Amino acid sequence: PMLVALLLASGLAPARPPLRQLAAPAPADAKARVLLAMRGGEARMSAAQAFGLYAPAMGVLTSNALYFSALPAVLAARNSGDLGPFNPLPSTIMIHSVFGWLCYGLAVSNPWIVASNLPGAGAVLATFAVMLPLMGNSHPALSACQLTFVGGAMATLCLWTGLVFAKVAARATLVGYFASAIFVVLAASPLSTIRTVLSTRDSASIYTPLTLAQCANTLLWTVYGVAAAKDVFVYGPNGIGLCLGLVQLLLKLVFPTRKR
């Protein structure tokens, strides 16, 4: 289903810029001023131009760091044969989130969004493929992960089936809503173990690299969305994700992971 969605995204991109195009093409003289400022010339880059260039460029790195963050832990768990306190639900949701954003980036022809999700797509698929056998038949999150994977795939198929009958101008908007909703669920998913964290006063189930990557990534994309792109599909879900990431970080500080 993910491959079908990507093929449709590339084919359904509207001939004219969509209603929510992230960044209108800059005039030639504006581009020249930006290049001159970057090379140390006399022209000065405005704050909006700086945010529009550096924030998404760094966001490409932090987005992929977010998607790659769980892979080392899962590979280490494969060697030991046990996932331990690792929460597998966020890694499952990441599959649908990365493909949702990748489809949105293709639909609105935004290279920043495509670059920030394309490498991560391989990482989340590898993480899930390694993680699933380690869960066995007795892992408490097995049913939730299976339901999330199948349910997300069916939701993606239903979305793209509906887009065939939607107007061209509405397609990018609908994909944006879909990707945003999944990302908010992803950002909140580490808190699925909050009851365990509070009862045991141990935040081991909240994976620190994922939390740090989420905070850095959502901060950069929120700044880019507000200052440069002015796109609610960028700053909306990322702003919510930043707040949820800070909650996770607070729990990590209040209830440190116990040494094992």
Task: Give the residues covered by each predicted segment.
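N-terminal chloroplast transit peptides
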Residues: 1-24
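Soluble extramembrane regions of membrane proteins in the secretory/endomembrane system
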Residues: 24-28, 36
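Alpha-helical membrane-protein topology signature
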Residues: 34-260
